[in-house]
């Protein structure tokens, strides 16, 4: 449970900061759909560094919030994706989305343009030739309620480069499978999830594994490379 529950720590999952000084605060330039979402318990603290943008993916066929992402337009990388599991969205009603004729396998994020007016993300930076896969941070397998929600997980802004042995067949994959198995059985009403990778340099890039060369990626902080 949240608040006074028993989800860990001496305070039983309840913050001692009654004023919630770490809460996300809406800014004047935020679209209304973002303002409405950033107070959700699944949302981590937004970076607010001038180049990061919260993108909220709504399912307009149902009015449901599908998932949200923080996109760093300087790094040309997403920082995390967050979403919820509850009885209203865990049903597996559709198969894995497949692009139709003329569609990209990993579409550009239309909400990045509609919500923030950003149109310069027009490349696929994933260095697949160097052993990386397109890693869904909000997994497509977690969003099978309908095809709208399923397709949104394939947006490039939901991707980070991932090693298959760890992420698609190893520890990460097992964690996701375990979460999916437990989600329909949870006693409380909602499971709040946030996942991502570390892309923020600290000191001399000590939080980054490194940069992988990818000639197509010309607009990143380090041209020709992407952070991993």
Question: What function would you assign to each model-found segment?
Answer:
Residues 1-228:
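Domain-level detector for secreted/extracellular nuclease and nuclease-toxin modules, and
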